[in-house]
Amino acid sequence: MNPHERIERHFSAHIEAAQEALTMLGDAIEIAAAKLAHCLLSDGKILCCGNGGSAAQAQHFSSEMLNRFERERPGLPAVALTTDTSTLTSIANDYHFDEVFAKQVRALGHAGDILVIYSTSGISPSVLSAAVAAQDRDMSIIALNGRDGGTLAPLLRDTDVEIRVTAPSTARIQEIHLLITHCLCDLVDHQLFGE
């Protein structure tokens, strides 16, 4: 396969994954956006976490909320739990890496807040621990998950929202998670600030 054919294959796989996500996940995205807007209107905040590329996506979502998406508006309270290297490394060193997000959720999260989890597999112990900590704090969870949902999917309650991209490729899951993130940002802005 030559380079151009490889490029075409990536674009085709992306388009196919996006179309499947639109068909399968539109309702869940809409529900998640409504929950985020309700949380913010109720003076709650959003905490975000993930590992690796999913950490970058958590930071991206948080920055779009805190700063702006595609229009001028006041900043919205969102915190990426992935950014403070002193906190992350002290928790990992003093306790265990599994606790890097959970300890922050227990310290910062309150009833009515939302934890947004990004995971391509649903099996990372650190996000699983964060989910349990959020539930203990009576927080809702929005999980941008992947593949078969892993161990995360069965942890979720009826009040939580799972947006699961079932693509077999980590790259495709991350691409669709980014598209979903932008949909959530747009819908939250629309619900809070109108057209």
Curated annotation (Swiss-Prot):
The keyword Isomerase applies. HAMAP family: GmhA. GO terms for biological process: carbohydrate metabolic process; D-glycero-D-manno-heptose 7-phosphate biosynthetic process. This is Phosphoheptose isomerase. Binds 1 zinc ion per subunit. Gene3D superfamilies: Glucose-6-phosphate isomerase like protein, domain 1. Its EC number is 5.3.1.28. Its cofactor is Zn(2+). It is found in: Cytoplasm. Belongs to the SIS family. GmhA subfamily.
